[in-house]
C-alpha cells in the first residue's frame, strides 16, 4: 500500500539549532498519528514542512507519492485541497465574520459564491455543534472553546482527506478540552 504521507530523512535547522534531524515516517490512508514531544522539539516545524509553509533543508516529503519539497505554491494547489488544518491559535481573521472564516478556502481558492459558501459554513458549524447565531459574529466575540470549534469547522469544511491538528486543546479548561477532543473524533470518522 502506498503511504498517504511519507517523510524520508527530513532535516530542518534554524541557524545552529537542528530541529528536525532525519525524520522518517509513513502514514497510511485511514490511519491516525499522534506526535508527542516537548516544547521546541519540532512538532510544529514538521507540520509546517508537510504543509509547505517551511522548506526542509534536506529530505523528502511526499503526499500520495508526489514529492512536495521544492514544489511551487501553484503546484501545491491540488495537494493543499486534500489538507485541513486546525492551528494551535485558531488562525481566524477578526476582520471577517465567522461564516467567511469557515468558508475562506472555498471563497478564496475555489471561487465559491457567497450564498453557497454561507451554506457550507452552516453545515460545517453544525458538525461542530455550533448554530447559525454565530455566523455574522467576529471571531473576537467568541469564547476560547467557540474559537476552537470555528477553527475545527474551517478545517473540515472542504472535507479534506488529511487533517492536521496542532495542539487543538491548548489553553482550554478540562471540560472544553473533552468537548473538542470528542468533536475531533466525530469529525474525522
Model regions and ranges:
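ABC ATPase NBD coupling module
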Residues: 68-84, 114
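Conserved ABC ATPase signature
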Residues: 138-142, 146
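Conserved catalytic motifs of ABC-family nucleotide-binding domains
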Residues: 159
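Catalytic Walker B motif of ABC-type/P-loop ATPase nucleotide-binding domains
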Residues: 163-166
Amino acid at each position: 500500500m502506498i503511504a498517504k504521507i511519507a517523510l524520508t530523512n527530513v532535516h530542518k535547522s534554524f541557524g545552529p539549532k537542528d530541529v528536525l534531524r532525519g525524520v522518517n515516517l509513513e502514514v497510511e490512508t485511514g490511519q491516525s498519528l499522534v506526535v508527542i514531544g516537548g516544547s521546541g522539539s519540532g512538532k510544529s516545524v514538521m507540520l509546517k514542512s508537510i504543509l509547505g509553509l517551511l522548506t526542509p533543508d534536506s529530505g523528502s516529503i511526499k503526499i500520495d507519492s508526489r514529492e512536495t519539497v521544492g514544489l511551487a505554491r501553484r503546484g501545491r494547489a491540488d495537494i493543499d485541497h486534500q489538507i485541513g488544518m486546525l492551528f494551535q491559535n485558531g488562525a481566524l481573521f477578526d476582520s471577517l465574520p465567522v461564516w467567511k472564516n469557515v468558508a475562506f478556502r472555498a471563497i478564496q481558492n475555489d471561487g465559491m459564491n457567497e450564498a453557497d459558501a454561507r451554506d457550507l459554513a452552516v453545515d460545517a458549524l453544525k458538525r461542530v455543534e455550533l448554530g447559525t447565531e454565530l455566523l455574522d459574529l467576529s471571531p473576537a466575540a467568541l469564547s476560547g472553546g467557540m474559537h476552537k470549534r470555528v477553527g475545527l469547522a474551517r478545517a473540515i469544511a472542504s472535507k479534506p482527506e488529511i487533517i492536521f491538528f496542532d495542539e487543538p486543546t491548548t489553553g482550554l479548561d478540562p471540560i472544553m478540552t473533552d468537548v473538542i477532543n470528542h468533536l475531533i473524533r466525530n469529525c474525522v470518522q
